[in-house]
Curated annotation (Swiss-Prot):
Reactions listed under catalytic activity: N-(5-phospho-beta-D-ribosyl)anthranilate + diphosphate = 5-phospho-alpha-D-ribose 1-diphosphate + anthranilate
GO cellular component terms, semicolon-separated: cytosol
UniProt keywords, alphabetically: Amino-acid biosynthesis, Aromatic amino acid biosynthesis, Glycosyltransferase, Magnesium, Metal-binding, Transferase, Tryptophan biosynthesis
Annotated Mg(2+) 2 binding sites: 227-228
Enzyme Commission numbers on file: 2.4.2.18
Stated role: Catalyzes the transfer of the phosphoribosyl group of 5-phosphorylribose-1-pyrophosphate (PRPP) to anthranilate to yield N-(5'-phosphoribosyl)-anthranilate (PRA).
Cofactor note: Binds 2 magnesium ions per monomer.
Top EC class for this record: transferase
SUPFAM superfamilies per record: Nucleoside phosphorylase/phosphoribosyltransferase catalytic domain, Nucleoside phosphorylase/phosphoribosyltransferase N-terminal domain
Name listed for the protein in its UniProt record: Anthranilate phosphoribosyltransferase
Binding, Mg(2+) 1: 94, 228
Protein family per UniProt: Belongs to the anthranilate phosphoribosyltransferase family.
UniProt-listed NCBIfam families: trpD
Length: 349
């Protein structure tokens, strides 16, 4: 099926099969469609609502065309990632949580990009911290193996995305591609915490990841709108484990953490996000730093559980608390800065 045939189906509110979606996505991602066709396709899909079959097909093609990262093992390797688009403009929680997971003994294959709608994307934050991002796949793999955390810059590993960049930017709306980023980790991780911008996506995306071979995944959305675990409200979870998807909710009090507002955690730049994270992972001199530390723990703990390094969310949160409060997480951030500095010089030659 070509994109014209797909558009004809979509405007009549007819779904595509997985195979049909794969055919259309290959055309888009290999430069065989016009910007007008891509924009119409994305808007049509959004208005119709994407099915699990369609998302599976789109993800499969993006993974196929990605510049992958080969790791010696995927055991205990996890990604903490969100779709973004929650409008909260709080600091980069998932990036900070990645260093806590590494400090607790996990391996993090972090996949991310620059900000699209927010003030600071994961790439913006890490660049502000002095972490070199233009790494080869082999260099990322060494970061993960040696430091315990490596960052895969989406625009480096998904070069075919350039064909959809213009239409996405001009539309200025959430589209299918907002869902695809967290599902197309170049290392092929099978353990993830995926934050989404609406609760309606939790179970469908867990089902998508199940079909694509994931093993232990938490797809989450907080009742206050965050695409991650929140301190201010209950968090809805669709958990994929042992081949089954179940849904439930948790609150901070379930883990001995006090519910509180997120006031003071908003940032207006990558530098502001970095300063708050350094305080949270360090001595926590400010009230905002103390609150940020609790939010980081609330998100790092589930990642340790998804990585099967903890037998429960409660145990994962305790492990994350210990790793943050020993200062090891702050050391992991500094270690990644130093480790990637070598590659900055190497790649410049």
């Amino acid at each position: 099926m070509d994109i014209k045939g797909a558009l004809n189906r979509i405007v009549n509110q007819l779904d595509l099969t997985t195979e049909e979606m794969q055919a259309v996505m290959r055309q888009i991602m290999t430069g065989r469609c016009t910007d007008a066709q891509i924009g119409a396709f994305l808007m049509g899909m959004r208005m119709k609502s994407e099915t699990i079959d369609e998302i599976v097909g789109a993800v499969a093609v993006m993974r196929e065309l990605a510049d992958g990262v080969q790791l010696p093992t995927l055991k205990h390797v996890v990604d903490v990632v969100g779709t973004g688009g929650d409008g909260a403009n709080i600091f980069n929680v998932s990036s900070a949580a990645s260093f806590v997971v590494a400090a607790a003994g996990g391996k993090v294959a972090k996949h991310g990009n620059r900000a699209v709608s927010g003030k600071s994307g994961s790439a913006d934050l890490l660049e502000a911290a002095g972490i070199y991002l233009e790494l080869t796949s082999e260099q990322v793999a060494r970061c993960i193996d040696t430091v315990g955390v490596g960052f895969m810059f989406a625009q480096v590993h998904h070069k075919a995305m350039k064909y959809a960049a213009g239409p996405r930017r001009e539309l200025g709306l959430r589209t299918l591609f907002n869902m695809l980023g967290p599902l197309t980790n170049p290392a092929g991780v099978r353990h993830q915490v995926v934050g989404v911008f609406t609760q309606e996506l939790c179970k469908p995306l867990a089902e998508v990841l199940k079909r694509l071979g994931s093993e232990h995944v938490l797809v989450v959305h907080s009742r206050d709108g965050l695409d991650e675990f929140s301190l201010a409200a209950a968090t809805h979870i669709a958990e994929l484990k042992d081949g089954e998807v179940r849904e439930y909710e948790v609150r901070p009090e379930d883990f001995g953490i006090k519910s509180q507002t997120l006031m003071g955690l908003e940032v207006d730049s990558p530098q502001a996000s970095l300063e708050l994270i350094r305080d949270a992972l360090g001595r926590r001199k400010t009230e905002a730093g103390q609150k940020a530390a609790e939010l980081i723990v609330m998100n790092a703990g589930p990642a340790l559980y998804a990585a099967d390094l903890a037998t429960s969310l409660h145990e994962g949160i305790q492990l994350a608390h210990d790793a943050l409060h020993t200062g090891l997480a702050r050391e992991k951030m500094d270690e990644l800065v130093a480790f990637t500095a070598v590659y900055r010089e190497e790649n410049a030659q």
